[in-house]
């Protein structure tokens, strides 16, 4: 919030029990670590690495039901609630799934600790991965100079005998949308040192655009726990709403307590965001501003796939940086739906995923994600924005 770090948050739109495997978790962590290395070098700021994982098993839906042909069933609301299979028994909500969410989240966190503390996250290893990405990609030449700069810096430190422990392990935090209040309440504990309540289902939790009503249960719950809290703000958000959320969720104006995650859409970001940032800044509140360039840029293709275009995602991030640069405020971070696998869910990017390509590896349980290559390409482009901020 004070401009002394950059926030990188990424992971699945909706986690599934089936995808909670060591390989899948490792690939997501690897992608986030690769992105963070590039962003950190070019921003000269610490990068706070946050996964949308170990709890992101529930999703709000615009429609309560889904119809296929003549059959209408309850909508899939994430593995925490029901199953994606289109049958009556699978779509029937089952509260026993929440126990499985807890157990799967615990197992995921154990794997995260192993990967981030056991040498897998060594900065030199991450740099070698990035070099491999550049060498194998169709657009590698564009980023080769940037990678070479990082390589020279690492080589200089190695030649000087510098081998800090910080190179070998990283702090990695877990986050999810606090959607199912009963689950979050069941995992709220009183800290023995401070006697304050914390939701121990995750380090960071956020409230979605659909559930951020001031008099709603989600805002009321978030106001009572001491975790850092995020709130999604869409294109219809007003300054008064933002200020009211600050009063409710952070009445003491504690820096870093509240994050506003903007999801405006590329067409709206430059028109809507300035008034929000300016109004909040003038109020004296110190919030962290993070760009979610995914949710405001979703559309359906002619062949029936929900998708996003890489250029729209990039343009929203670019607009986010432009607004903050003009106002003299800190573009605090990005919030990305991504996977470490080579899926084909979002269009464009250096590998030019086409509408026809969507058919080959469209694997998401909910919304489309950037694949490994698109995620890394975005990090190099955001790194350029950070350097010029």
Question: Where do the protein language model's features map onto the residues?
Answer:
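N-terminal basic/disordered segments at the start of proteins
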Residues: 1-6
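N-terminal signal-anchor module of multipass membrane proteins
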Residues: 10-11
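Active-site-facing alpha/beta catalytic cores
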Residues: 14-15, 19-265, 308, 316, ...
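Short glycine-enriched loops at secondary-structure junctions
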Residues: 54, 294-295
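Non-transmembrane, aqueous-exposed alpha-helical and coiled segments at domain scale
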Residues: 242, 257-289, 295-343
């Amino acid at each position: 919030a004070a401009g002394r770090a950059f926030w990188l948050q990424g992971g699945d739109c909706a986690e599934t029990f089936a995808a909670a495997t060591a390989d899948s978790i490792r690939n997501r962590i690897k992608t986030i670590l690769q992105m963070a290395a590039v962003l950190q070098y070019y921003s000269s700021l610490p990068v706070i690495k946050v996964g949308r994982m170990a709890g992101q098993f529930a999703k709000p839906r615009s429609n309560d039901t889904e119809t296929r042909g003549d059959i209408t069933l309850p909508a899939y609301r994430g593995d925490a609630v029901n199953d994606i299979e289109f049958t009556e028994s699978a779509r029937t909500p089952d509260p026993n799934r929440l126990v499985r969410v807890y157990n799967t989240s615990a197992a995921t966190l154990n794997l995260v600790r192993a990967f981030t503390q056991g040498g897998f996250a060594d900065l030199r290893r991450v740099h070698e991965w990035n070099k491999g990405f550049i060498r194998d990609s169709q657009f590698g030449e564009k980023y080769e100079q940037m990678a070479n700069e990082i390589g020279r810096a690492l080589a200089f430190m190695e030649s000087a005998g510098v081998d800090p422990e910080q190179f070998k392990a990283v702090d990695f935090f877990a986050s999810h949308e606090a959607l199912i209040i009963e689950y979050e309440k069941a995992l709220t504990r009183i800290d023995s040192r401070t006697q304050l309540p914390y939701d121990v289902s995750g380090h960071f939790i956020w409230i979605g655009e659909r559930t951020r009503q001031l008099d709603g249960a989600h805002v009321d719950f978030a106001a009572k726990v001491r975790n850092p809290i995020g709130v999604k703000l869409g294109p219809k958000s007003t300054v008064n709403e933002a200020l009211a959320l600050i009063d409710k969720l952070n009445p003491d104006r504690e820096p870093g307590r509240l994050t506003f995650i903007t999801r405006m859409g590329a067409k709206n970001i430059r028109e809507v965001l300035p008034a929000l940032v300016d109004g909040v800044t003038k109020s004296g509140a110190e919030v962290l501003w993070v760009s979610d360039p995914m949710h405001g840029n979703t559309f359906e293709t002619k062949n029936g796939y929900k998708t996003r275009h890489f250029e729209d995602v990039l343009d929203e991030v670019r607009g986010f940086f432009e607004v903050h640069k003009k106002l003299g405020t800190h573009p605090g971070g990005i919030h990305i739906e991504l996977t470490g696998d080579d899926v084909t869910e979002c269009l464009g990017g250096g590998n030019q995923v086409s509408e026809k390509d969507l058919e080959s590896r469209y694997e998401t349980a909910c919304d489309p994600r950037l694949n490994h290559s698109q995620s890394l390409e975005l990090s190099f482009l955001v790194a350029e924005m950070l350097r010029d901020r």
